[in-house]
Amino acid sequence: LIATPTGLGANIYASVYGKVTEITDDRIIIEAADEQPDEFVPIDVPEDASKLDMVKAAGVVGMGGAGFPTGVKLNINLAETPMGEINPEINPELPKDFSIDCGYILINAAECEPGLEHNTQQIETQTDKVIRGIKYCMEITHAEKTIIAIKKKHHKAIKALQKALEKESAITMHLLPDIYPMGEERAVVRECLGVNLDTTQLPSAARAVVVNVETACRVAEAIDEKRPCISKNLTVRGKLNGGNAAHVYMDVPVGVSVGELIEKAGGIDGKYGEIIMGGAFTGKSTELDAPITKTTGAILVTVEFPDLHGANVGILVCA
């Protein structure tokens, strides 16, 4: 444990054994030890710690990109949470007495940004962990049901879930259309529960909590293994040697440099435009020496920018 929040935030753990050599406004620099044991240092919690306490102690955050502390998000009793006020102007088809019968965990498995594949790969290869994480989220929040929201195109992941859910009556799947931005939180609520929320409303207004699929797995690790949140799944692709195929890396230690992962994926193929950390729509330009964080979803290397002879280019409307 190398940092604790003073306000809204989450614990931060070192992903390597070593010595802190420098602290800046946005980084803690660690000189890694020559020998790196495979095992991690378990989170320090009392024997009678609740599952929510374990999630908080582990520093789990929303792994889909937003990074909101999961221990705060799950700190709700959905069984006792009333429906929020539904705006009839954006819900003209709903009856005045519309209600949602129980609390829901909505698992965001849309992996909405184009080109990303690490969420679907985790579903395919770690289905049991996904289900365990879902059940823990349900238990903590007193949710009676879960809906896994996943795009129709992810056939292999859907098949893996169908098999895993054969005996799980409280967990179902909802197939999303293959369009952007289906992974936006309120879009998931709308698609799964049929309610349009105002932009100022949280999913709790629909008696729901939205959890990214990787986040659910980190919840399972915190509870089952007392594992701190020290790694990230991500996709690397773009203008790389060997082509534009997706390179999926699971459990990458937080703090590894962008450049190191690009080299692992084959290295940059000649000249390029920029390196984007995050998705193609919502990511930000970054540098080779930048570290990945708990919220890094992808590293994309773009082609060279065309010469527009000084013309201004921008997105007028996005989503």
Language-model features: locations:
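Generic structural motif
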Residues: 1, 13-22
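Residues forming the flavin
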Residues: 19, 23, 82-89, 174, ...
